C-alpha cells in the first residue's frame, strides 16, 4: 500500500494563541510540499491571526488599502502581500481562519470554492443563521453583509492552500480602513453582530470541522 493511501484521513490542527501571518504562510508552504510527496494526510489548520491586512493576487495595486500601508501599520496592523486569490482583507483576533492543505479529489477549482462556501454555510446553520452565496462574489453572506472571505491558492499536484476567514467575534472596525475584497457596495458582519452575543470559537471550530467532513469527506482519499 502506498504512503498516500495510508494517509487518507483528515488531520485537524488548532494552532494556539495568535499566529503571525508570515509564520502561517511559511507553515502552509511546508505542508503543501509534504502533502504533495505524501508525507502527511490532508490537513486543516484552524487559527487566529494578530491584526493584519493581506492583499491577494487579484489586486492590481494598493488602492483597496484605503489611506495606504504606512497608515495601516500605524494602527498596529501588519500588511502582507499574499499569494492567495482574492483582493484586500483583514485578519485579526476573534476571526476563525481555516487553511485546508488538501489534494483535490475532484480537479475542479470552482467546485472547491463552492464546497468551502458550503462548509461555512452549514456551520452558520448550527447557530440558526442562513448563510448565502452571492451571484458575483466568492464568500458567504448573512443578511446582505459578508461574514466569510475566501481566497485560495492551487499548487502543482492539485494541492490547495490558504482558505477562509470567518468573522466570529472580530472587531469589524478594522474593515472600515479598507475596501474589503474590493467590494464597495456591501458591508461586513460577524456571528457576534448577528446574534447579539460573543460566540465561543471552540464551538464554531466544531461546526466547521463537521461541515468540512460532510462536504469534502477525506478530500485526498
Curated annotation (Swiss-Prot):
Keyword Translocase among UniProt keywords: no
Keywords (A to Z) from UniProt: Acyltransferase, Cytoplasm, Transferase
Organism the protein comes from: Rubrobacter xylanophilus (strain DSM 9941 / JCM 11954 / NBRC 16129 / PRD-1)
GO biological process, one term: protein modification process
GO CC annotations, alphabetized: cytoplasm
More info: In the reaction, the free carboxyl group of octanoic acid is attached via an amide linkage to the epsilon-amino group of a specific lysine residue of lipoyl domains of lipoate-dependent enzymes.
Keyword Cytoplasm set for record: yes
One GO MF term: lipoyl(octanoyl) transferase activity
Catalytic activity: octanoyl-[ACP] + L-lysyl-[protein] = N(6)-octanoyl-L-lysyl-[protein] + holo-[ACP] + H(+)
Pfam families: LplA-B_cat
Protein family: Belongs to the LipB family.
NCBIfam families reported in the protein's UniProt record: lipB, PRK14345.1
Compartment(s): Cytoplasm
Name of this protein: Octanoyltransferase
CDD domains to which the protein is assigned, alphabetical: LipB (cd16444)
Function: Catalyzes the transfer of endogenously produced octanoic acid from octanoyl-acyl-carrier-protein onto the lipoyl domains of lipoate-dependent enzymes. Lipoyl-ACP can also act as a substrate although octanoyl-ACP is likely to be the physiological substrate.
EC number(s) from the headed UniProt entry: 2.3.1.181
Domain BPL/LPL catalytic: 38-220
Active site: 181 (acyl-thioester intermediate)
Sequence positions that bind substrate: 84-91, 149-151, 163-165
Amino acid at each position: 500500500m502506498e504512503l498516500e493511501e495510508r494517509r487518507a484521513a483528515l488531520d485537524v490542527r488548532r494552532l494556539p494563541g495568535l499566529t503571525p501571518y508570515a509564520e502561517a504562510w511559511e507553515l502552509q508552504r511546508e505542508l503543501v510540499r509534504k502533502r504533495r510527496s505524501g508525507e502527511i494526510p490532508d490537513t486543516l489548520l484552524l487559527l487566529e491571526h494578530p491584526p493584519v491586512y493581506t492583499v491577494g493576487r487579484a489586486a492590481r495595486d494598493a488602492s483597496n488599502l484605503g489611506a495606504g500601508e504606512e497608515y495601516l501599520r500605524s494602527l498596529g496592523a501588519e500588511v502582507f502581500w499574499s499569494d492567495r486569490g482574492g483582493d484586500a482583507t483583514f485578519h485579526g483576533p476573534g476571526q476563525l481562519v481555516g487553511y485546508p492543505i488538501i489534494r483535490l479529489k475532484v480537479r475542479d477549482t470552482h467546485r472547491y470554492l463552492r464546497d468551502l462556501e458550503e462548509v461555512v454555510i452549514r456551520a452558520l446553520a448550527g447557530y440558526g443563521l442562513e448563510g448565502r452565496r452571492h451571484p458575483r462574489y466568492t464568500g458567504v453572506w448573512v443578511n446582505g453583509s459578508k461574514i466569510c472571505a475566501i481566497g485560495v491558492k492551487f499548487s502543482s499536484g492539485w494541492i490547495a492552500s490558504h482558505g477562509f476567514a470567518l468573522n466570529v467575534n472580530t472587531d469589524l472596525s478594522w474593515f472600515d480602513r479598507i475596501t474589503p475584497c474590493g467590494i464597495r457596495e456591501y458591508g461586513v458582519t460577524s456571528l457576534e453582530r448577528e446574534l447579539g452575543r460573543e460566540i465561543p470559537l471552540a464551538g464554531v471550530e466544531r461546526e466547521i470541522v463537521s461541515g468540512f467532513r460532510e462536504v469534502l469527506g477525506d478530500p485526498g482519499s
